Amino acid sequence: MIKLTPRQAEILGFIKRCLEDNGFPPTRAEIAQELGFKSPNAAEEHLKALARKGAIEMTPGASRGIRIPGFEARPDESSLPVIGRVAAGAPILAQQHIEESCNINPSFFHPSANYLLRVHGMSMKDVGILDGDLLAVHTTREARNGQIVVARIGDEVTVKRFKREGSKVWLLAENPDFAPIEVDLKDQELVIEGLSVGVIRR
């Protein structure tokens, strides 16, 4: 059994509440505000102590890079996690990628969305997907020609229109300034992470 100080137990409880209510952990600043610390640095020291005791795991360099081993978050069914930049090799829905939660019902989209992916760049501007938009994504490994997909090639995640002929796949931009990405599945792995089912502009 992990032995925690009262303060550490209080912080761990707050992290659990955030995971249950929002689906993602708090930032250091949010912990400092909730617990009355003068600065996020004080929260960081307590988090390091919790990590040393094995109560949490921390991802360096990520503002929300906190997870509790064995703890399954139950996010609000009327909200979706917003995914920012995806780290190389990490699952898209890894906690360190979640920036915030957006209050929109997943069933608003068809098929229902599993998460919102923040768009970076203008490669899909001609179909109205712009830099900074939130792309609603339905998680699936299957895609048909012509669908807009979230695809992973090596360590890169990209949003493009899907086209396949035999073992050849083309990921097509909707902007003439961007060349198609061609992948031969015999030589290179390509993973479909999901389908675009909508766009939110803030």
Swiss-Prot record:
Single Gene Ontology BP annotation: DNA replication
Active site: residue positions: S123, K160
Keywords tagged on the record: Autocatalytic cleavage, DNA damage, DNA repair, DNA replication, DNA-binding, Hydrolase, Repressor, SOS response, Transcription, Transcription regulation
Pfam families: LexA_DNA_bind, Peptidase_S24
Record's catalysed reaction(s): Hydrolysis of Ala-|-Gly bond in repressor LexA
DNA-binding region, residue intervals: 28-48
Site features described as Cleavage, chain residue numbers: A88, G89
Principal EC category: hydrolase
Any GO molecular function: serine-type endopeptidase activity
Top-rank taxon: Bacteria
Enzyme Commission number(s) from the entry: 3.4.21.88
CDD domains recorded: S24_LexA-like (cd06529)
NCBIfam families, A to Z: lexA (TIGR00498)
Entry-linked PANTHER family: LEXA REPRESSOR, LEXA REPRESSOR-RELATED
Assembly behavior: Homodimer.
Family statement drawn from the similarity comment of this UniProt entry: Belongs to the peptidase S24 family.
Function, in words: Represses a number of genes involved in the response to DNA damage (SOS response), including recA and lexA. In the presence of single-stranded DNA, RecA interacts with LexA causing an autocatalytic cleavage which disrupts the DNA-binding part of LexA, leading to derepression of the SOS regulon and eventually DNA repair.
Protein's recorded name: LexA repressor 1
